[in-house]
Amino acid sequence: MKKNKWLLLVLCCICGFNAQAQQFVEDSIKVDGHMRRFDVFLPEGIKPDAPLVFYLHGYGGGIYRKNPMVETASREGFAVCIPQGLKDPKGKPSWNVGYPFQEGWKVDDVKSLSKIAAYVQKRYHLSRENTFLTGMSNGGEMCYLMAYSKQKAFKAVAPVAGLTMVWMYRDLEACKPIPLFEIHGTEDRTSEWTGDLDNKGGWGAYMPVPLAVGYWVAKNRCTKEETERVEGLNKENGHYIIKHRFTESATGCDVWLYEVVGGKHSTHTEDIKTGDEIWSFFKKTMKE
């Protein structure tokens, strides 16, 4: 009997250690009849009420655990939720941002992501006040759509290589200011820096990046622009970054735009420490 008790104790210790060492948790909830899958990254030693950052994949992508936010989270002590988009009418996992080929698709990703956020906050004891949203490409477009919406789940957004669709710019009026940070390459041929007002690329008409970001500068009533040029981390590719920071906002919501000169369609981790830069921006907005 004693031997069995000792064996049980040893097994409990081993299981407890493995549970503590496991940093990624697979989870899901049902929203509007769809199972919404996501992974949650919980760094070692994470504290109750820690911040939460959502990372959204690009068009056709999936749950990518090696995204720029995870490494930063492991050092800074915040959680990362990595959701999986549903398949659109073309059969590609994506976020419903109103591309022409998504017409008639009834998935409401604003609602779904808000529901996931509420669940993850409660289930993993994370901060409701300090939950943020970032994403790449199609995930970046979703960041803009979320910013325009009436959602209350996300305190700030940081699209990377993201676009504002013309329909958003013309038809939507943001109900409140929100801190926004865009990182974008000037040589991006998928999500053009100069926009695509004639829908030559097939994604739908979208705004030039500086003009799209300018909407939020005005909406947030920023009164000062600071500009800084820095060399990229990779000295061989010749890229450099112009950091446009729009500050002294009357609403307390700053806007940043990092113009990666020479940068293509990517997360720009060769040019800057993307995860650290995004976290630095989010951190400025945090509620203590």
Residue spans for each PLM region:
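A domain-start/cap signature at the N-terminus of enzymes
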Residues: 19-52, 61-64, 72-75, 101, ...
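Alpha/beta-hydrolase active-site loop
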Residues: 102-124
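Bacterial Sec-dependent N-terminal signal peptides
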Residues: 1-23
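Active-site glycine-rich loops that stabilize anionic/oxyanionic intermediates
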Residues: 57-61, 263
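Cap/lid segment of the alpha/beta-hydrolase catalytic domain
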Residues: 85-108
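Short beta-strand/loop motif that positions the catalytic acidic residue
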Residues: 182-184
